[in-house]
Amino acid sequence: MNRRLIICVGLLLFTFSSFAQLRDIPKEVEQAFTAQYPNATAVEYRDNLVNVKILFTHKGEKLIASYNNAGKWKETEKAWNFEQLNADIKDGFQKSKYADWKVTETKIVNRPDGVELFRVKVEKNEIQKKHLFFNAAGRLIEDFITL
């Protein structure tokens, strides 16, 4: 019984992963990415139908860039450590209503027009999880529910 279940699950995962790429990556996205990051290496495109996420290495750092289907850059994120955030951001988090939530992930997010935000993923329990976006001064700019 267990063996059959494992085989079925394995076949399902294989089937879903082989059909995950439903279409070719839009040329506009590829061109915009190549223009923005000409020296990127280890490039991996992930098509989400409404946007494309691109995992890559640039100047020794692992990054994720997001573009819409027309090739317009939305943001680039880089993994970061909460303890490395400046004192203003940590203070802003401690003064927020999420201070008692557990920090599970921190990223630096660069957006068009030179906007740099610091995304802190927090969770209170298995159901209540949020992405918090702080500016460099420690002000909470946005918060979104996440999975």
Where are these regions (language model features)?
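Short, low-complexity, Pro/Ser/Thr/Gly-rich segments in the mature regions of secreted, periplasmic
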Residues: N135-L147
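Mid-chain, structured segments of secreted extracytoplasmic proteins
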Residues: A65-T106
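Positively charged n-region of N-terminal signal peptides that target proteins for export
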Residues: M1-I7
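A short linear hydrophobic-aromatic micro-motif
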Residues: N39-Y45, K102-K107
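Exposed beta-strand-loop-beta-strand "reactive/processing" segments of non-cytosolic proteins
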Residues: T41-I64, G114-L132, T146-L147
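N-terminal signal peptide c-region/cleavage motif recognized by signal peptidases
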Residues: T15-S17
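Boundary of Sec targeting at the N-terminus
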Residues: A20-Q21, F33
